[in-house]
Amino acid sequence: MRELIWLDFRLSIVVGVVAPLILLGWAWLSKKSAIYNILTTYWSVSSLLGITIFLLIGSLPIAFLVGWLARIIIPLSLWWWEDLNEELMKQRGLIRSVFLPWRWGISFYFAVGTLLGTFFLPCAFTPTTEFGANCKAVLEVPLLFKEIVFYSIPIPNLTAFGIAMLVVFMLFFASYLIFTFPEQGRFYKRKAST
């Protein structure tokens, strides 16, 4: 299981961070607004995975649930907007030819990750002191990340940062669902056309 966890980490860096960062810059430079808007939504939602890393550094059980939910909502954010998808289909160029396979690939990657993540969901409801081998194996990656990037910052500070960012994310997400969501996307388009 450890090998699978480390493989997931490596893949997430390449397909979940590096590739969309390059695509975002490319979309901005080439002024492809549909791709740019889809990717800014992706980055907003995928920040939940970054928050998960900070929660895992603190060995908080809720991190397992947060990470699993992130793997569900991230692909949704890539496909949800009908207007952007329609605009994307009208666009031409190399970036579109790169973006579309990446979007399918990352969606497949997160679908598989969601299925595999169900094996770790029990960790979300287990006290830290009773973590089994699988739960502890998941913690290895964030703890190594902490040692490399945040070696001088105490774990409680990073954990508090993760909790604060989760609260901020939840407030923004709730605000979006209550105020913005009804006025945009699929439901707004249907309502406007009737």
Residue ranges and their predicted role:
Residues P20-G25, S46-L55:
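Hydrophobic, membrane-inserted alpha-helices
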Residues K31, L56-F64:
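Membrane-interface helix caps and helix-loop-helix hairpins in membrane proteins
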Residues L49, F64-C135:
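Membrane-proximal helix-loop-helix units in multi-pass membrane proteins
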Residues A34-W43:
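Membrane-interfacial loop-to-transmembrane alpha-helix junctions, especially the N-terminal start
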Residues W104-T194:
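C-terminal membrane-adjacent module
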Residues M1-P20, P156-I163:
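Hydrophobic transmembrane alpha-helical segments in integral membrane proteins
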Residues M1-W6, G25-I35:
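Short juxtamembrane and helix-loop transition motifs at transmembrane-helix boundaries
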Residues V15-K32, A174-L177:
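N-terminal signal-anchor/start-transfer transmembrane helix
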